[in-house]
């Protein structure tokens, strides 16, 4: 829970990474208690094939609530979202969930880029620019979340 409070966006990405790890290597669930507990939750929530833990969904909901508050309160934040929206809309249209929120799309973008880098696949300069924007938005949200 310390990671969640310190950087909620990293917390969500960390949970997604663990979910994928446990799907790929279920036998590793016994490596430590945290993995064992998360594996049990994944089985209980019936997401061993796909989907996200309720822990991750709840954290994303918290981030979404903060995002919506900031959209109403901060013109600079609203401007950053407007600027990245066209790129996020393209990303959303290429997923199986085109109605996902902008914040979830930012997280998906960063997660997909991480996977591409692990595979040593090239990242276009346009994608790197959008990554930079998404990172700044998520950093700001995480910082604001931590200060609450």
Per-range role (PLM):
Residues 1-51:
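N-terminal interaction modules that seed assembly of large macromolecular complexes
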Residues 5-8, 15, 53-56, 74-81, ...:
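Amphipathic, non-membrane alpha-helical segments in soluble helical-bundle scaffolds
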Residues 17, 37, 41, 55-62, ...:
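Charged, amphipathic alpha-helical oligomerization/scaffolding segments
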Residues 21, 41, 66, 87, ...:
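Residues that form generic nucleotide/phosphate-binding pockets
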Residues 24-28, 44-48, 69-72, 93-97, ...:
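Intrinsically disordered or highly flexible coil/loop and linker segments, enriched in small
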Residues 34-74:
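Heme-based O2/NO sensor domains and their adjacent alpha-helical segments
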Residues 68-101, 109:
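Charged linear interaction tracts used for macromolecular binding and regulation
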Residues 90-148:
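Glycine-rich, aromatic-bearing surface loops/beta-hairpins
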